Structures are given as C-alpha cells and as structure tokens.
C-alpha cells in the first residue's frame, strides 16, 4: 500500500511540474522578466498563451494596458 502511494505521489508531482513549466517552453524565466514599459509586442489580439509561446515569445496577462505576448530578453554570454 505504501509503495502505491509513493508512485501516485511521483506521478502527481511529475504532472504538476510539466504543466507549470509549459508557460515558457525554450525560454528561461529571466528572459521573460521584461519590465512592462519595455515589452515589445509579439502577438495579436486574443492570442493564447500557447500560440504566443509557439512564436518564441513570453506571455503574461497579469498587467493590463501592456502587451501580454511580448519578445523575450536576449541572453548574453559573459566573456572574461
């Protein structure tokens, strides 16, 4: 019985992590940390989060009056 509960927990955790990680497929959270005033529109009216992400863009609908689908920040390499 304990083994079944363990595997159930493993499956639930795997499902939860895959659904929450889907917001920025191929993008890091840092790339999508664009200040609202600096967002460059990357979508169109009524674009869904999935459609936006498929375009290689970030989606954040928590701030009204700014683009919700926007271009990510470009990651730069540090060279010393």
UniProtKB/Swiss-Prot annotation:
UniProt function note: Involved in the maintenance and repair of the intestinal mucosa. Promotes the mobility of epithelial cells in healing processes (motogen).
Name of this protein: Trefoil factor 3
Residues annotated as domain P-type: 30-73
SS bonds (residue pairs): 32-58, 42-57, 52-69
Signal peptide from the UniProt entry: 1-21
Subunit structure as annotated in this protein's UniProt entry: Monomer. Homodimer; disulfide-linked.
Example of a GO cellular component annotation carried by this entry: cytoplasm
Gene3D superfamilies: Spasmolytic Protein, domain 1
SMART domains: PD (SM00018)
Source organism of the structure: Sus scrofa
GO BP field: maintenance of gastrointestinal epithelium
InterPro entries the record matches: P_trefoil_chordata, P_trefoil_CS, P_trefoil_dom, P_trefoil_dom_sf
Main location: secreted
Lineage: Eukaryota, Metazoa, Chordata, Craniata, Vertebrata
Keywords: Cytoplasm, Disulfide bond, Extracellular matrix, Secreted, Signal
Subcellular location, record wording: Secreted, Extracellular space, Extracellular matrix; Cytoplasm
PROSITE patterns: P_TREFOIL_1, P_TREFOIL_2
């Amino acid at each position: 019985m304990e083994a079944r509960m363990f595997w159930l927990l493993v499956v639930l955790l795997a499902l939860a992590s895959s659904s929450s990680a889907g917001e920025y497929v191929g993008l890091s959270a840092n790339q999508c940390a664009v200040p609202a005033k600096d967002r460059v529109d990357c979508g169109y009216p009524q674009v869904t989060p999935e459609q936006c992400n498929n375009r290689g863009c970030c989606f954040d609908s928590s701030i009204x009056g700014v683009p919700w689908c926007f271009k990510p920040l470009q990651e730069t390499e540090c060279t010393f």
